[in-house]
Amino acid sequence: MRLQIKDIKIIDPLQNRDLIGDIFVENGRIVSKFLGDADKVVDGRGKIAVPGLIDIHSHLREPGEERKETIYTGTRSAAKGGITTVFCMPNTKPVIDNAPTVEFVLLKAQKEGLVNVLPIGCATKGSHGVEISEIGVLKKAGIVAVSDDGLPIANSQIMRRTLEYTKMFKLPVISHGEDKELSKNGVMNEGKNSMILGLRGIPKQAEEVIISRDIMLAELTEGYLHIAHVSTAGSVELIRQAKKKSIKVTAETCPHYFTLTDDIVKGYNTNTKMNPPLRRQEDVDAIKQGLADGTIDCIATDHAPHMEEEKNREFDLAPFGIIGFETILSLILNELVDSGVLSLSKALSKMTSNPAKIFNLEGRGTLKEGNIADITIIDMKYSYEFKKENIVSKSKNSPFIGRKFKGGAVMTIVGGNIVWQV
């Protein structure tokens, strides 16, 4: 199909482009122009075209937990949020530690997915932290990184060997920063609020101990380390110092960590329970500073769907996690861009050019001629209330229900095809 987007503001962080013009798409690729008429013309006046957003951390739950989310419902939710590519974590049932499971996810996504789905493979077999997965086989099958997400690799020797082994394949190791002994039985941030609420806390050091260790191992091995869902000021500083030493470390955070504090847990709303937990205001401020100075490279959702009956339990018993596909862009615009923490271009780079570079995604992350036509169209004046009944994810576990937003995705284009529009 030939698609023309007319008179639209184009922002492409990688190419340092910020101009008004037309975008031409033919056979799923961006072209300079084409002869003849377009099959479809989109009026872009008053809107912004950006490279398709890439979410490097999500849980699609398929195979095994389709009652919470499926590849179809998850990618539909992502498309609504302006996301054109999602990475899915391997903690499915069965876990993604073998080629057939990778192939299942890719085939299912090809048949039913609205956006691109790229699997992350288990770093260790069964995510048990004992024996390294057959990473070469997984890479050949189509993974983009390895992780035992949800679990740290507790054995330092295994983590060292994983960093050494994955270096051969230029695959990042995604680290889940949590010392399970320090966080054991904890359900929220350890501090004044946990004492007042009578809830067992998770100290910041549970995250920082593992991040510190993994940075040291990345320095030792010269492997590629990516740190997931950074939530504390101490973690930001550890990563900042590692980058100053030219250690191969990159990092992500999530919107809830630059938007909410553990004060919101006072209502015992289980949709404020996630792992890592919400921290204090000084941590929120440090996350924002880390995004501004480049310490934190990416913003991801950690989209973690759970059924209402699972969340509608005592705070102690409810599972960790919230959904995030449908709110991430608006939260970035409202919390980071509108407040002046980041320019629009720099904010967008956290979900476009930076993830594409870190995870070697050829043809994505920029609107360069010849690239895959994954495009997100934003309307900064688009106002809406995030209502439970309008959520398209199979699960509804979000702390942002009822919040009013200004600015968001109004059209999502994947491979030259319009997969969502307001």
UniProtKB/Swiss-Prot annotation:
Keyword annotations from UniProtKB, A to Z: Hydrolase, Metal-binding, Pyrimidine biosynthesis, Zinc
**Functional pathway:** Pyrimidine metabolism; UMP biosynthesis via de novo pathway; (S)-dihydroorotate from bicarbonate: step 3/3
The entry marks the following residues as binding Zn(2+) 2, namely D149, H176, H229
Which cofactor does the UniProt annotation name?
A: Zn(2+)
Which catalytic reaction applies to this protein?
Answer: (S)-dihydroorotate + H2O = N-carbamoyl-L-aspartate + H(+)
Which terms in the Gene Ontology molecular function aspect does this entry carry?
allantoinase activity; dihydroorotase activity; zinc ion binding
Ligand binding (Zn(2+) 1): H57, H59, D149, D302
> Which top-level group of life is the source organism from?
Bacteria
Cellular component GO terms held in the UniProt record: cytoplasm
GO BP field: 'de novo' UMP biosynthetic process; purine nucleobase catabolic process
Q: Where does substrate bind?
A: H59, L60, R61, N91, N275, H306, F320, G321
Instruction: State the free-text cofactor note.
Output: Binds 2 Zn(2+) ions per subunit.
Residues at the catalytic site: D302
Q: What family, per the record?
A: Belongs to the metallo-dependent hydrolases superfamily. DHOase family. Class I DHOase subfamily.
This protein's name = Dihydroorotase
Q: Which organism is this protein's natural source?
A: Endomicrobium trichonymphae
Gene behind this protein:
pyrC
